Design a protein with these regions (language model features):
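Glycine-centered hinge/linker elements that transmit conformational signals in sensory
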Residues: 11-46
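Conserved C-terminal helix/tail region of periplasmic/extracytoplasmic solute-binding proteins
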Residues: 34, 167, 173-234
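Short helices/loops that flank or line small-molecule/ion binding pockets
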Residues: 46-65, 200, 204-209
Length: 234
């Protein structure tokens, strides 16, 4: 969220890594870690979701979660973090808009070039990515946020959505406002590798593998240089 929300420039400009925002993130992450603001559980592990409950061995160890939209629909990760329907924190969470809008992930649909069903495959892709009627039905059935601004605008204006995981709050209004502020101009083909290298370097610093901010920065730069060989890393 910090990487893709706080940066105003792409990771790579004119073939060179732009690490100007990294120092602030390293300092912030280490301070939060040292003050106990970070639970220490790794995202998507068995120890992570139970920290959202108010009972059990991992109870009350987190203030909140960063989730993708599919995780806050019925049957998603948030429901597990609440202990399921009737759980100790079921319906007690709320969704808020963060100080910056950010983006991550996505789903790729690929078609085998020698398929015998090219027409059907094309229809499927169109239906899933551009057919407003189909996307509206998906929103209504799944409670997920789709990549169609018109559909989501109509959904939020209807005001009929009520998410029991948030005690009846309409998550779509919050998500729509946040998504509308996303700046995709900073996206690059290198984001996944560079973000992962930054996370690994900062985790090592917080866990004592490296001992200073300079060491953390150098570890990050070395990792990017090894992983992304077609850019300049200085």
């Amino acid at each position: 969220a910090y990487s893709n929300g706080n940066r105003t420039k792409s990771w790579v400009n004119d073939g060179k890594l732009d690490s100007s925002s990294v120092g602030d993130f390293i300092s912030m992450a280490k301070e939060n870690f040292d003050k106990g603001y970070i639970s220490g559980a790794t995202q998507w592990t068995d120890d992570w979701l139970p920290q959202g409950m108010s009972d059990g061995a991992q109870a009350n160890k987190t203030f909140g979660f960063f989730f993708p939209t599919w995780a806050i629909a019925k049957g998603g990760s948030l429901e597990q973090a609440e202990g399921g329907e009737g759980g100790s924190t079921y319906g007690k969470y709320a969704l808020c808009e963060g100080p910056t809008s950010w983006f991550w992930g996505g789903t790729w649909i690929c078609v085998y070039p020698k398929t015998d069903n090219a027409k059907e495959a094309g229809q499927f892709i169109y239906t899933m990515t551009a057919n407003a009627d189909a996307m509206q039905k998906y929103v209504d059935a799944r409670g997920d946020f789709v990549n169609n601004k018109g559909v989501m605008d109509a959904t939020t204006k209807a005001g009929t959505n009520s998410n029991p995981l948030f005690g009846g709050q309409d998550q779509f209004q919050i998500l729509f406002n946040s998504a509308d502020k996303i700046d995709m101009s900073i996206a690059s083909e290198y984001d996944a590798k560079i973000n992962t290298d930054l996370q690994n370097a900062v985790q090592d610093y917080c866990n004592g593998v490296t001992s200073s901010e300079d060491d953390c920065m150098n570890a990050f730069l070395d990792a990017v240089a090894a992983d992304v060989t077609d850019i300049t890393v200085e």
